[in-house]
Swiss-Prot record:
Binds 1 zinc ion. GO terms for biological process: negative regulation of DNA-templated transcription. A zinc finger (unnamed) spans 3-34. Negatively regulates transcription of bacterial ribonucleotide reductase nrd genes and operons by binding to NrdR-boxes. HAMAP family: NrdR. One of its GO terms (molecular function) is DNA binding. Belongs to the NrdR family. Its cofactor is Zn(2+). This is Transcriptional repressor NrdR. Residues 49-139 form the ATP-cone domain. InterPro entries: ATP-cone_dom, NrdR-like_N, RNR_NrdR-like. It comes from Shewanella piezotolerans (strain WP3 / JCM 13877).
């Protein structure tokens, strides 16, 4: 790695530590030439599959879209940001684990509902009502009845 201060190509690692629950490595480095120290973070570059929408169009996976949907569902509910981030991480891990280059948006929606049902039942019903396009009260009743099983 080039030194950010003098652009020398020779640097040495002084200290390495795992951070972000072991998903990243933090390294303290020192330039052999100018002796400046700096920190780098190293993590695996994990490629997410493309999303195939219901109309057949394809688009890149958008984590912010997923986060936004979950935040809307849990709005004003007793769910912490840590719980939300853990759920998003589980969804992303499941998508990567498929090994597929493309996944259907329906799969992502179902994974989201699986996470929400464990986080907060009201948030699950909110999300399901939009995702499954509930038309009347009876569909809400069916979804609630399924939760009580």
């Amino acid at each position: 790695m080039h030194c950010p201060f003098c652009s020398a190509t020779d640097t040495k690692v002084i200290d390495s530590r795992l951070v972000a629950d072991g998903h990243q490595v933090r390294r303290r480095r020192e330039c052999v030439q100018c002796h400046e120290r700096y920190t780098t973070f190293e993590g695996a570059e994990l490629v997410m599959p493309r999303v195939v929408k219901q109309d057949g169009s394809r688009q890149p996976f958008d984590e912010e879209k997923l986060r936004g949907g979950m935040l809307r569902a849990v709005e004003k509910r007793p769910v912490s940001m840590d719980q939300i981030e853990q759920s998003l991480t589980k969804i992303k891990s499941t998508l990567r684990a498929t090994g597929e280059r493309e996944v259907k948006s329906e799969m992502i929606g179902n994974l989201m509902m699986d996470q929400l049902v464990n986080l907060d039942k009201v948030a699950y019903i909110r999300f399901a009502s939009v995702y499954r396009a509930f038309e009347d009260v009876s569909e809400f009743g069916e979804a609630i009845a399924n939760l009580q099983k």
